[in-house]
Amino acid sequence: MPGNSPHYGRWPQHDFTSLKKLRPQSVTSRIQPGSDVIVCAEMDEQWGYVGAKSRQRWLFYAYDSLRKTVVAHVFGERTMATLGRLMSLLSPFDVVIWMTDGWPLYESRLKGKLHVISKRYTQRIERHNLNLRQHLARLGRKSLSFSKSVELHDKVIGHYLNIKHYQ
């Protein structure tokens, strides 16, 4: 009976305290810095939004194409500062070759390192972007499921990366 439901006529209230307690790590523990070498690291950024599409939130991350795992990730605006935060997380790792798309900030940040700019060599991370969009509805471009706060957006996606790649 519709009248017997405790939520009849109003939306149920959700308790997000368990999500707010999440403390996802930003770097993998599967690869030991200094002892393991990352031969090919693909880097890319993925667009998302919080509340409205005008409030963009970017996920920058590096993907080890041989181990098929995410090495590190950061959230922020699509700027050199966010890319710098990702690079500082990756600095303890011995990366031989960096592979990126044609975004100009990658070229300026990776000057002096072995850097390949090609769509052909970033297809694994681009496929991983698609997998993230398929698994996490809040990353979909046209979806009714979107994040309402920056904190929960970062924690939910970070927790997913922890479960699938960092443990």
From Swiss-Prot:
Q: Does the keyword Nucleus apply?
A: no
Q: What is this protein called?
A: Insertion element IS1 5 protein InsB
Q: Does RNA-binding appear among the keywords?
A: no
Q: Which GO terms describe its biological process?
A: DNA transposition
The Swiss-Prot or TrEMBL record describes its family as follows: Belongs to the transposase 27 family.
UniProt keyword annotations, A-Z? DNA recombination, Transposable element, Transposition
GO terms, molecular function = DNA binding; transposase activity
Q: Which InterPro entries match?
A: Transposase_27, Transposase_27_IS1
Alphabetized PANTHER family for the sequence: INSERTION ELEMENT IS1 1 PROTEIN INSB-RELATED
User: What is the documented function of this protein?
Assistant: Absolutely required for transposition of IS1.
Quote the gene name from the UniProt entry: insB5
